[in-house]
Every structure is written in C-alpha cells, then in structure tokens.
C-alpha cells in the first residue's frame, strides 16, 4: 500500500520503477546502471572467466558501493556471487540461532531485529542489482564501499556477539541452577 502511494506522490520513485520495468528503453540515461549491471553479470561466466582485472567493471556506474555485486560476478564468476549470497545468508542464520538461544525476550528481539535488518539490506542491494526489485542504492554489508554502512554493520555484529556471549553465560547459569535443584 505504501509503495503504491509513494509511486503516485514521489517522482524519483516513479523514475526508479520505470527504470526497473524496462531499463533498456532508457539505456542512454537513467537505465544505464541497471543495464551495465546486467551486462556485467551476464558476461561474468559461471566461474572465473577472464581473471581479476581483465573484465570491464569500470563500465558500471557506482561500482564501488551500490553495484559491487555485479563487479564481483563479472570478475570472479556467478558461482562466486552465489557463494557470497550463501555467506551472507549463513550470517543471518547464525543471528537467528543466537536469537533462539537467548533466554531474555529483549535479547531475542534485538538479535532478531538486527538479523532481519541485515537480511533486508542484502536483499535490497542484490535484488536491485539483478533487477529483481527497483534499485535502491543500499550497499551490501561489509562488501560495498561506504564508511557509515561498514561502521553500523560492525556495531551490529559486535552487539550480536555480545548477545551470543550473554546467551552462553545464561545457559551455563541455567544449567548450574538446574543441577543445584536436582541435588
């Protein structure tokens, strides 16, 4: 509902949706980023085709931040890009594991919220690069260039690491209390 309202009110949203629907009709203008991204992913082969530095990643606008996934797929191959997605998904799964192991509701919800934010950021970035959704300009956590993005992601990882240590100490304390009660 909000997306429909935003599409009607904001012109930049209308432009992004139009580029998402048919980027090749605007290849000389606003569709250049998405078209070059799709060309890079398509020419990257399944595995390392030309070698590092022998592709043409400089043709992709904003290649260091928003469209780094297409550069990775072109330089290292689509299989490497899929492996990167699996690494990011495994981070999310670990966040959910820490969330389920926490005993306190606040810790569970905090870890769950950070994990969903992390996954949503990955989805927005890779989805925009592959034309699955309109491009949003969101970076891939810890992969794309962007100082604020890297710092905030590292803070999130540190908080989740702290929650993991708390979950371990809570588990040890719970087992200790349970052992004392059984004696």
List the predicted regions and their residue ranges.
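Membrane-interfacial segments
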Residues: 10-14, 96-103, 136, 163, ...
């Amino acid at each position: 509902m909000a997306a429909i309202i935003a599409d009607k009110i904001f012109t930049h949203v209308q432009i992004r949706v139009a580029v998402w629907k048919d980027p090749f009709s605007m290849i000389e203008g606003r569709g250049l980023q998405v078209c070059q991204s799709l060309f890079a992913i398509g020419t990257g082969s399944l595995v390392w085709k030309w070698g590092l530095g022998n592709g043409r990643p400089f043709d992709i606008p904003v290649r260091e931040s928003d469209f780094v996934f297409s550069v990775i797929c072109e330089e290292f191959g689509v299989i490497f890009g899929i492996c990167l997605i699996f690494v990011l998904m495994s981070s999310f799964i670990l966040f959910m594991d820490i969330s389920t192991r926490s005993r306190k509701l606040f810790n569970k919800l905090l870890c769950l919220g950070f994990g969903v934010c992390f996954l949503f950021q990955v989805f927005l970035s890779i989805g925009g690069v592959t034309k699955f959704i309109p491009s949003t300009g969101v970076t891939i956590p810890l992969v794309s260039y962007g100082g604020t993005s890297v710092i905030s992601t590292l803070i999130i990882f540190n908080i989740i690491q702290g929650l993991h240590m708390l979950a371990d100490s809570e588990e040890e304390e719970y087992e200790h209390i349970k052992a004392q009660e059984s004696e």
